[in-house]
Structures are given as structure tokens and as C-alpha cells.
Amino acid sequence: MPEISLRHVVSCSSQDSTHCAENLLKADTYRKWRAAKAGEKTISVVLQLEKEEQIHSVDIGNDGSAFVEVLVGSSAGGATAGEQDYEVLLVTSSFMSPSESRSGSNPNRVRIFGPDKLVRAAAEKRWDRVKIVCSQPYSKDSPYGLSFVKFHSPPDKDEAEATSQKVTVTKLGQFRVKEEDDSANSLKPGALFFSRINKTSSASTSDPAGPSYAAATLQASSAASSASPVPKVVGSSSKPQEPPKGKRKLDLSLEDRKPPSKPSAGPSTLKRPKLSVPSRTPAAAPASTPAQRAVPGKPRGEGTEPRGARTGPQELGKILQGVVVVLSGFQNPFRSELRDKALELGAKYRPDWTPDSTHLICAFANTPKYSQVLGLGGRIVRKEWVLDCHHMRRRLPSRRYLMAGLGSSSEDEGDSHSESGEDEAPKLPQKRPQPKAKTQAAGPSSPPRPPTPKETKAPSPGPQDNSDTEGEESEGRDNGAEDSGDTEDELRRVAKQREQRQPPAPEENGEDPYAGSTDENTDSETPSEADLPIPELPDFFEGKHFFLYGEFPGDERRRLIRYVTAFNGELEDYMNERVQFVITAQEWDPNFEEALMENPSLAFVRPRWIYSCNEKQKLLPHQLYGVVPQA
């Protein structure tokens, strides 16, 4: 598209002595046009073109302006034409946001406005005068203007045909390269490559029915490979079955078109069956081999190879689906990279621990979130879990990455069950008699226990994860290996044994006159405190959003976060429109007035309101604890 040349500056509302409006007529980008002083609301300049032209596109380089508008007019009305003689060519367009204007960042943004961005009625006419209006209402610290402006006319048909004809003969120094193909006028990216493939395929197949037959065999081979990928696993070291000689060239051309993702997925899929072979027991191996010979497609369809073959970039967002992560102890930029990788794998992110959170990714122990989640019974893992899942492109069991101090087998095996179902095929028959194993494990050897707060309160990520966790609990009890590591079960057993040993002691002495009645009531009628379920916390802060402002003495900030989270409240990291209550230990601040102007429903309260609600175990009126401006 040819560039429209500018003749001179007709008028200018404001210009600097150094950065004058005539700089827009020059091609150098470092020559700018700026206002005479800072703080001007709008500035404008009128430029005269060489002749009447139809404007096809506009290129504008900014220099601190927030908005730019382009109008067009005709010099037939005289140099002192009014505003009514100008028509809008480009509506007011934004070049800097309010935050960028106040901070002074990105002042030299360049935008190209094509014919689809211009007003059609004005772009179809011919003009010889252009008026540019710039404004900056957000910043009054520095002058603003434009770096450059360029106008382009629509390309001519003769020039387009001339350029298309010049493509056929190209001169490189003293040599001239001539195209042999007659269809060189309509060259497209990749056209020569595909024409070469068509030539080789037509030369190899003489009959005209060849391409349709090759397409049919291609569809049949792709359907067979997607239905049963068994030969890839069996003959991992050998080459795949050779096609007929007549179609070999066609298959070679198709292999060139295959994406490089399948060869990269090959080594990972070949290594995984080797890991599952030693886990088979000698008794289960001979029983499984006849079943594999009889029905070769079914067990391999349930194994690792189809899942490994399907695992690719298109399923990357489903690897950690249903997982809600919270980060603790990391600093930027690694914190943002770790969060982006978790979100890329399909997980959800929370800034603080919420009831729907499933994993706390901690850099080191003894952080405030670490202590909070450890007290609530959550799962705390290292950062390597997310990094390895992202690197391996599959979900790994989180129990391998648990931080020190957590030994809950039922929670740890929840992930291992879902992963073992994907990784190890021989374990599937062992998990089918699940109800029997659960009833046997719940026999006299293991006394019944009430549900813990984790089982009653913590919501499960999904129905599938819940069933997987129960299945792994029953399997862990059958094996008996993980039962010793369950700290809560051991504490309950020890407490119950102590209660069973304590009643006979006063009866043997016989000196306590109140021993008989209290023992009978304790053993037969009232249950012990250890058998009672832990009461659930009230959720009177549900649906309320809090923001902690200012400094708090000692560990008061940690206590406030703990109470708000315990009563199902939401804590915001920064001030936004969702905040309803601002908790502060300071007096009235001038910033509170600005916040009230933007959000009149805000309430500024003392920390004592949170403590009083905790003592009364109900929601108290916050007006009694409000922060008001001093007279």
C-alpha cells in the first residue's frame, strides 16, 4: 500500500519548541510532536496532504496520549474551516490505560488501523486534510503527543498485477531464476511441497482409481491403529508390519505429515509396562497369560498403552482436574511459574486455604499456612509434585511428595488409586471384590470409629475421587501395612484402652463410695468423649468477604485469618469490589473515604468483632465495633 505524503501543517493548538508539529512530516520516529506544557486536556493538529487521496489505513505511534481521534476534511472550505466540515475517520481509540497513564508505562505504543477499523463512509471518499485530536485526562505530570503518523492509500490493481507477474522471474545478482511451473501465479505457502507429493503418488499408481483406494486403506489403517494399539507394545524393539510394496511410497509421504508428538510419546509408553511387570505376583502371572491370549484386546485396552498414547498436549488440561492447590513459601517469579503450570494441568488456584482446597504446595515447613493446613488435616506436598506431573504429562501419586509429619494412609492412597488404575493393569482384578474386603476389615480386629473432621467436613473433589479413596482405604486395611501409620486410629485405640482399664480400679479398692454408680452410668448409658464426633464449626461468615488493612500487633493477623477461615469466610489479598468488611487495628484513615466513594457498602470494623463472634459462636452486629472518623 503506497504511503500518502504530507505537505505541511495547517494549524496546531499546542506544540513544544523542540518537539513541534512539523516533526510529524518527517519520517524519523525519534522526532515527536508534544504539547507546550503538561496538564492540557486535549491538543490537535491539522495536516495538509499533497493531493486528495482515499485513506485505506492509518499507522499511529503514541507518545503519552491516552486517546487519539482522526478526522478528515477538505481544503475547499478554506483554512479556517469549522468543526462541521470534518468527518470522523477513526473513532477515539485508546492507547494507554488509566493505570499506565499514572505510572508512565508503555507511552510509545504503536497501533495499525486497517480498513475494518475505519469509518466506511469516510474511508470511501477522497480527502486532502487530516485533523488529529489527542487527549490525556488521567495524568497531568508530563506533556504528551504523538511519535509519528502515517496514512496509506488503497493498492492499485495495476500494481498488484505487476507484482504478481514479477514473481515468475526473480533476479539474484547476475542470475535470473525462472519458474517452470505454470501455476506459479497462484503460489501459496506449502504449495510446492504438496505438488511434489502429488507427483510422486501419481507416478507410483498408474490406474486412476489409486488415490481413492489409498484413501480407503489410510482410513482403515487409522481405524485399526486407534482400535487396537497392541503391536506397538508387543514388538517394541522390532519395526511395525511392513505395508504392501505398491503403497510404500504413499505411506512414506504420509509419515512426513505425521506430527512429532507420537514418536516422543513412544519411549514413555514403552518404559511403563516394564515397571508394572515386577509388581505381578508369581501366582497371578500364569492366570493372566491365558486370558491375554484368549482375548488379546481387552486387557491391553485397560492397560497403560492406550492411556499413554492418548496422553498429549490436548489432554494436558485434564491431568490435575479436580485439584485445588494453595501455594506457601514461594517468591516470584518462581511462584507465578509454579501457579501457571498447575493451572495449565487443569488444577484450580486459591490464594488461601479454603474448604474446597485439596493440596498445599509448600516450599518448607513451619510456615503459617503449613501450620493451619496441618491443623485442619489437609494434604501438604512439595513443589516437585507439580513439576514432575508437568514434565511427565500425567498425574503422579502425591504420597511420594508428602512433607514430613503427615502419615494419613487413607488420604495418601486416594491419589495412588486413581493413578494405579491408569498405570498398572494387573491391579484391576484385585479391586473388584471391594465390599467383601471392607466388611472383613471392619470385623472385631478393628473397632468401629466415628467419622473424623476430614471425612465429615472436607468436601471431596468429585464422586470418582471419593470412591477411589474408599477403595484404597479398604485395600490398605486388607494388606495391613498402612494401618500402623494412621495416627488418629492409634490415638483412639490408646484412649479407649485407657478408659477400659480405668473402671476396674475403684471397684477393686472399694473405698470410694461413689465408685459404683459412676462406673455403671459411664459404661452402660453415656458414651465416652472419645467416641463422640467432633462438632462442626458454624459457618456464619459464609458469603462474606474480608480484607485485613494495616499493621496488627503480634500474631493477631494470623489469629484473624484463622477465625475467618474457620467460620467459612473469604479473605481477599487486595482491595476489590467483593470486599464487604475491612478489619483494621488503626484509627480512621483518609484512604477509607476514597474506598467508601467507590463502594458505599463497605464496613470498617475492629478485630474485636471477630473475637466476639468466636466467643458467642454466632454472628454479632458489626455496628458496635465499627471504626468511625474522629470529630
From Swiss-Prot:
Residue numbers bearing the Phosphoserine modification: 142, 201, 206, 228, 261, 371, 408-410, 445-446, 460, 484, 517
Description of post-translational modifications: Phosphorylation of Ser-371 causes dimer dissociation. Phosphorylation by CK2 promotes interaction with APTX and APLF. Sumoylated.
Phosphothreonine PTM positions: 200, 281, 452, 456, 487, 518, 522
Basic and acidic residues composition bias: residue spans: 242-259, 299-308, 415-426, 490-501
Gene3D superfamilies noted in UniProt: BRCT domain, Galactose-binding domain-like
Region named Disordered: 225-315, 405-537
GO CC terms of this entry: chromatin; chromosome, telomeric region; ERCC4-ERCC1 complex; nucleolus; nucleoplasm; site of DNA damage
Compartments in which it is found: Nucleus; Chromosome
Protein name: DNA repair protein XRCC1
Name of the gene this protein is made from: Xrcc1
